[in-house]
Curated annotation (Swiss-Prot):
Keyword Kinase: no
Functional description taken from the UniProt entry: Arginine methyltransferase that can both catalyze the formation of omega-N monomethylarginine (MMA) and symmetrical dimethylarginine (sDMA).
Record-given protein name: Protein arginine N-methyltransferase 7
Keyword Repeat listed: yes
Annotated GO MF terms: histone methyltransferase activity; protein-arginine N-methyltransferase activity
Enzyme class: transferase
GO annotation, biological process: chromatin remodeling; methylation; regulation of DNA-templated transcription
Gene: PRMT7
Enzyme Commission numbers on file: 2.1.1.-
InterPro entries: Arg_MeTrfase, MeTrfase_PRMT7, PRMT_dom, SAM-dependent_MTases_sf
Length: 720
């Protein structure tokens, strides 16, 4: 620690008490990185841990935990029940020493402490230790433990498990390990290295492990939608508009990252053709030290003709050594058709564990019925990868300096004919009245930089590329010739707007300021956080010409009342979770219902089409306009929603429609019908029963230009 080094290096004797205080303060403080949505700048928040004797701690900041999956996980009753049963089956010795790694709210630790007490462990030397490195969650766990009278029965460590030491922290090696460091892919949260380190440093010989084993499965599928999510080259060839993001022999210069992509595949059930039966990929035995790397060669017999566009995968947990307690993330069709008990397990919709999709490259791999295909599966410490028919695309997936990897939805958008046409026509109209323009691409849009450069050979294009930076510049150099422009036309600044000066623009006025808007790394954020474009436009105000063309020229905040029972249940407030009171976490985790007053949970980003059962209960309403011809300013809007369908209204979906050209009525919508965009979802404090002609809802919203946040309020009335 630098502060300690300064004290020790001054040559003065350092009082041991002063050093202890300093070390304690540093150990009880954490820094949380937060992205400012309007600037793209990273900001640090300081999270303090209260002293042990403080029995009325301040709750951890709500915004840090409300956007996590903890609440959804705690509402997963099948998961909670399976862990409780497995822990009770494992804790049979009253002298058991239990270690919970990645303890979260402490639920598994409390289950272990209760099971230990049931076998007399409190008087026989049994113990439970909980390791949670994320300080905001650790603070919340202490509140949960106090609420359940468990603060003296579970020892909490705010450390990573590889920082724990036997004798310094743990009295002796643990003989039972419980953990849930699992993601949708299974390995992505560091399960293997965590278990390896625990076996090496923290566990006794032959420990009991919960969960005991995991098995991953896969299935070959054909799906036009999944094909569009990864094959930009062939989809833009179908668009035939002359703009080539992936020209000629460079079809992989823009691609989806070669990894498993989490997705709610049940929502695609009606548009997927299954080309094989489910097949087993890897079995991970957690009851012994796991290997870092393995490879499996699998023969798969196809069940029909088609093109393999993707492999959909999932996993099944066996939580106990007896093989009687299971949890599965299998898609609905696999659970319904499987003859295996673990796969048949039926559970509620949840969002914290999804299925995963691995994309084939290009148009897919052709297959005929009853053909045997060879699949090579590999795993390292954090991921699983696939190679179908060996010698296929896997060897070419290394990322070169000019290659760009994007999220699947962005790939699909760039290949969408209607989206491309809207931008092309708008830019073409703008260039007819602008000769030799100076154009600033205010975001990370490769498409707009290529489009303007190829359409206007005399233009000067300045690409800000705050996220792409040097990789964006290398990419443009590679595709310039194929798009018939000189790379000398384009200058990549690689800066945020706050750092740009007139010198960067060669003291020329900007005639065109354009964006999609798209900021690399912000794709999963709330829709209005792309109003960063408005903030950029404001910072560049003095550099714009009087008649500058701005695209988009306006944003319109839209909303639609929705029935979202599955999402509501996963975000609903907690009371009893397997016998433990969790009501103290509701406000911090952003739960719905049973909060003080009419307090609502936060508005969160979701692909609404993936949110289980959904139903629109009203038409689409406009709530607020953002006029980009003006500098950024506060905005307020309100509307009255009249319902067109009866049902239970759980909240509303909200998004921004981008007006590219107001005169030509060219608008790009990002609403729920467009599956390439996330919407904001504001759930109500309580669901409302609505009827057409009888129910009315008033919604108000305000935009704060200093934070980029939009706050909502709503009230409903029923006419007799």
């Amino acid at each position: 620690m630098p502060s300690c080094c300064c004290l020790l290096g001054l040559g003065f004797p350092s009082p041991p008490s002063a050093l202890r205080i300093l070390r304690r303060r540093m150990a009880s403080r954490a820094f949380q990185l937060r992205l400012n949505p309007l600037t793209g700048d990273s900001e640090w928040l300081v999270v303090e841990e209260e002293e042990e004797e403080d029995h009325h701690p301040t709750p951890p900041p709500k915004q840090l935990l409300a956007t996590t999956s903890y609440l959804d996980m705690l509402n997963d009753s099948a998961r909670n029940r399976a862990y409780r049963r497995a822990i009770e089956a494992a804790v049979t010795d009253p002298s058991s020493r239990v270690l919970d790694i990645g303890a979260g709210t402490g639920l598994l630790s409390m289950m272990a402490a209760r099971a230990l007490a049931a076998v007399g462990g409190e008087t026989r030397g049994g113990s439970v230790s909980a390791c949670e490195s994320y300080l905001p969650m650790g603070k919340l766990m202490r509140r949960v433990l106090r609420a359940n009278g468990m603060e003296n029965r579970v020892k909490v460590f705010h450390k990573r498990s590889d920082e724990l030491k036997v004798r310094d922290d743990l009295d002796s090696p643990a003989d039972i390990l419980v953990s849930e460091i699992l993601d949708s892919e299974l390995l992505g949260e560091g399960l293997i290295p965590t278990l390896q380190q625990a076996y090496d440093m923290l566990l006794a010989k032959n420990p009991k492990i919960v969960p005991y084993r995991a098995t991953t499965y896969g299935q070959l599928v054909e799906s036009t939608f999944l094909w569009k999510l990864h094959d930009l080259h062939n989809n833009e060839a179908n668009a035939a508009d002359g703009v080539w993001l992936t020209p000629g022999e460079m079809e992989r210069i823009v691609s989806v990252k070669p990894q498993q992509h989490a997705m709610q595949c049940d929502a695609l059930e009606d548009e997927i053709r299954l080309l094989s039966e489910p097949f087993k990929v890897f079995e991970f035995d957690f009851w012994k030290r796991p290997d870092s790397h393995r490879e499996a060669n699998i023969k798969i017999r196809t069940t029909r003709d088609g093109y393999v566009h993707a492999i959909i995968s999932w996993w099944v947990l066996q939580l106990d050594s007896a093989g009687s307690i299971f949890y599965s993330t299998a898609p609905r069709w696999a659970r319904q058709s499987s003859s295996e008990g673990p796969q048949r397990d039926m559970k509620d919709w949840c969002d914290h564990w999804k299925q995963c999709v691995w994309f084939m490259q290009g148009k897919g791999i052709p297959a005929t019925e009853d053909q045997v295909l060879s699949l090579r599966a590999r795993h390292n410490q954090t991921s699983i990868s696939y190679q179908l028919n060996i010698n296929d695309e896997a060897c070419d997936r290394s990322s070169k300096g000019d290659h760009l990897t994007l999220l699947p939805e962005r790939i699909a958008l760039y290949g969408d004919k209607d989206w491309r046409s809207a931008l092309i026509n708008t830019i073409k109209n703008a260039l007819t009245v602008k000769s030799s323009p100076t154009c600033v691409v205010a975001d990370d849009s490769m498409f707009l930089a290529l489009l303007i450069s190829s359409m206007s050979p005399t233009s000067k294009v300045i690409a800000m590329y705050p996220g792409l930076r040097d990789k964006g510049a290398a990419y443009l150099r590679s595709v310039a010739d194929a798009n018939n422009f000189s790379i000398d036309q384009i200058q990549v600044i690689g800066k945020r707007a706050s750092s740009i000066t007139a010198d960067d623009l060669k003291h020329k006025k900007v005639n065109l300021l354009v964006g999609e808007p798209f900021y690399l790394g912000s794709e999963g954020m709330l829709p209005w956080q792309n109003l960063r474009f408005w903030s950029v436009r404001t910072l560049l105000d003095s550099m714009l010409s009087e008649d500058a063309f701005i695209m988009p020229c306006k944003g319109i905040l839209k909303l639609c009342a929705m029935s979202l029972p599955d999402l509501w249940r996963s975000r609903s407030s907690l009371k009893d979770v397997e016998g433990f009171d969790h009501s103290v976490v509701n406000e911090t985790l952003g739960a719905c219902g049973c909060l003080p007053g009419d307090q609502q949970g936060p508005c969160l980003p979701y692909y609404v089409w993936q949110c289980g059962y959904t139903k629109k209960l009203s038409k689409v309403y406009s709530l607020m306009d953002f006029n980009f011809s003006e500098p950024i300013h506060s905005c307020f809007g309100k509307t009255k929603i009249e319902f067109s369908h009866d049902g239970t209204c759980h909240g509303f979906a909200v998004w921004i429609d981008w007006v590219l050209d107001e005169r030509k009525s060219v608008v790009l919508t990002t609403g729920p019908d467009n599956r390439y965009w996330k919407q904001g979802v504001q759930l109500f404090s309580k669901p409302v029963e609505v009827n057409p002609g009888k129910s009315v809802m008033h919604v108000e919203a305000s935009f704060d230009p200093s934070t980029g946040e939009i706050t909502f309020s709503s009230s409903s009335t029923t006419c007799s």
